[in-house]
Amino acid sequence: LPYITTSNLYWDRFELGNLREMYFSENEIEKCTATKGDLLVCEGGDIGRAAIWMFDEDIRIQNHIHKLRSYTEVCTEFFYYLFYLYKHAGWIGGKGIGIQGLSANALHALLFPLPPLSEQKRIVSKIKESEPLMEKYADVEKYLDKLNTEFPDQLRKSILQEAVQGKLVP
C-alpha cells in the first residue's frame, strides 16, 4: 500500500508524486491510516511541520508522522495554526529549552489553549482573512532583506565608479 513519509508532508500541503509502498498488517492499518480531516504532524525532519489531510481517499502514514484526529469540540484548522505558531516561536523543534524531537510523549506534554469551538472557528477565520496581507508582508520583507544585503556592495561599486570618472574630487 502507498504511504506518506515526512518528506511528503509540508506546511499545509502534501507532495504525493513520489509515494513509497510497503505491506501493512491488519493490526497496523487502523493506527497507520489517515482519513479526511486528520492533522498530520512530523515527528522528525522538520519537527512539528503539519498539514491537514483533505483528500477523500485514506492514506497510510509512516511511524515518524503523528496523526491527530479531532473530536467534536475541536477545530482541526485551529490546531494546525497552533502548531505553526509553536514551531515558528521555537517551542517545538527549536534550540535551547524547546522540544528537540516530537515523540508521542512530547506531543502529549504540549499544552494548548482550548477556547470554545465557536471561538476556535472565529480565530481561524481571522487568520485566513489576514493571510494575503501576511504573504504580502513576507514578500516585502524578503525584498528588503535582499536590498539590505546587496546595498553595501552596490554602494562600494558606485563610489569606485564615481572615483574612476573623477567625480569625487571638487
Q: What are these model-derived regions, one by one?
A:
Residues L1-P2, S7-K36:
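Sequence-specific dsDNA recognition surfaces
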Residues E30, F55-E57:
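Short, conserved secondary-structure segments in the cores of folded domains
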Residues L39-V41:
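Generic structural signal for buried aliphatic residues
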Residues E43, I59-H66, G96-L117:
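A short glycine-rich beta-alpha junction/loop motif
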Residues G45-R49:
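Short, charged beta-turn/beta-strand-edge "cap" motif at the junction between a beta-strand
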Residues I59-Y81:
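Short peripheral tails and domain-boundary helices/loops at the edges of structured domains
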Residues C75, F79, A106-K142:
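Amphipathic alpha-helical segments
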Residues E131-P170:
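Short amphipathic coiled-coil heptad-repeat segments
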